[in-house]
């Protein structure tokens, strides 16, 4: 048994700490212009593709001009993937949604 499984909540706390460490490291990598090699190191090609798909899903949902089913067909992904993106977007803070709209508005789908 590992240390995180013997203490309820400890695993979740560690996961959150590790996530924040990654976010801080990524921010520093951007400052140092090392973000692309860092992301290539940290993410497999499939994970990078999944992130790119999630961005396209969020962009299309924010634009609101296609249904989830149409988006599924356009992206060639499962409806569950579209639904997860939609649910994440629904729970995002309003300021993040505004920022995303501004950042993604001129990016082609």
UniProtKB/Swiss-Prot annotation:
GO MF annotation, one: DNA-binding transcription factor activity
Please verify whether the record's keywords include Transcription regulation. Answer: yes
The entry's keywords: Cytoplasm, DNA-binding, Repressor, Transcription, Transcription regulation
- Membrane spanning stretches: none
Protein localization: Cytoplasm
* DNA-binding span(s): 68-91
Q: What are the disulfide bonds?
A: none
Cellular component, GO, one term = cytoplasm
Pfam families assigned to the protein according to its UniProt record, in alphabetical order: Trp_repressor (PF01371)
Q: Which InterPro entries match?
A: Trp_repress, Trp_repress_bac, Trp_repressor/repl_initiator, TrpR-like_sf
Q: Which domain of life is it from?
A: Bacteria
Question: Would the keyword DNA-binding be found if you checked this record's keyword annotation?
Answer: yes
For this entry, list what GO says about its biological process. negative regulation of DNA-templated transcription
Where is this protein chiefly located? cytoplasm
Q: Give the family per the record.
A: Belongs to the TrpR family.
Assembly description: Homodimer.
Q: Describe the function of this protein.
A: This protein is an aporepressor. When complexed with L-tryptophan it binds the operator region of the trp operon (5'-ACTAGT-'3') and prevents the initiation of transcription. The complex also regulates trp repressor biosynthesis by binding to its regulatory region.
Xref: PANTHER family = TRP OPERON REPRESSOR (PTHR38025:SF1)
Q: What is this protein called?
A: Trp operon repressor
The species this protein belongs to is: Sodalis glossinidius (strain morsitans)
């Amino acid at each position: 048994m590992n240390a995180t499984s013997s203490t309820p909540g400890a695993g979740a706390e560690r996961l959150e700490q590790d996530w924040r460490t990654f976010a801080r490291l990524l921010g520093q990598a951007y400052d140092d212009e090392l973000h692309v090699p860092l992301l290539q190191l940290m993410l497999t090609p499939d994970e990078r593709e999944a992130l790119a798909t999630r961005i396209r899903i969020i962009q299309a949902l924010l634009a609101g001009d296609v249904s989830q089913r149409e988006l599924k067909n356009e992206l060639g992904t499962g409806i569950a993937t579209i639904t997860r993106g939609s649910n994440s977007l629904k729970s995002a803070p309003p300021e993040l949604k505004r920022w995303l709209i501004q950042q993604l508005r001129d990016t082609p789908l």
